[in-house]
């Protein structure tokens, strides 16, 4: 039997099996674990009472997190004219139109979010095979296809959680970083959960927010009391 590493021993000592934590307790445990060699994110998984096989129960959205994510986000914008200027003023890292499409086709993908003005979708649509598999394809459902490109840039830069329910009915999102205090994580989690509740499909029956799990990149998943964060 392989020996446990120091980190694995620390995790085993810190985590109580089958315990349901308050959000503050979960953050305290994850922040107390031995640090990894990189800045770990704090991630949330929310099990929803939906059937993703049904098109009207696919929950998808974007939530602007009041305490941010702690990450530097590089944003590319497809726009021209006044919208392009507004995007630049809002802090976009790359702004272009046909030239930006050519750059992407040439392999330049040094950004985390792609935003497009509606009239740019005729150009962006041709990039689906490149942007789609990387989760970068602009979509109006998450606010990345919009005439207000400046507002979208500001939201992306300030820190957003983007999510889409997976085949198991779970959404996953980064909610901060290891080292964030519990108050900041609570702000972010409550905002995300409130948005998820607004997105509840009309055809979803029974319990909607079924389970919440908080984890760090290299750490364990801790079950959080749904009633502790849900309205």
From Swiss-Prot:
A Gene Ontology biological process in which this protein takes part is:
translation
- GO molecular-function annotation terms? rRNA binding; structural constituent of ribosome; tRNA binding
Keyword Repressor listed? The answer is: yes
GO CC aspect terms: cytosolic large ribosomal subunit
| UniProt keywords, alphabetically | Repressor, Ribonucleoprotein, Ribosomal protein, RNA-binding, rRNA-binding, Translation regulation, tRNA-binding
Q: Which Gene3D superfamilies match?
A: 3.30.190.20, 3.40.50.790
Instruction: State which residue ranges cross the membrane.
Output: none
- SUPFAM superfamilies in the cross-refs: Ribosomal protein L1 (SSF56808)
Q: Which PANTHER family match?
A: 54S RIBOSOMAL PROTEIN L1, MITOCHONDRIAL, LARGE RIBOSOMAL SUBUNIT PROTEIN UL1M
The UniProt family comment states: Belongs to the universal ribosomal protein uL1 family.
Q: What does this protein do?
A: Binds directly to 23S rRNA. The L1 stalk is quite mobile in the ribosome, and is involved in E site tRNA release.
| Protein name as catalogued | Large ribosomal subunit protein uL1
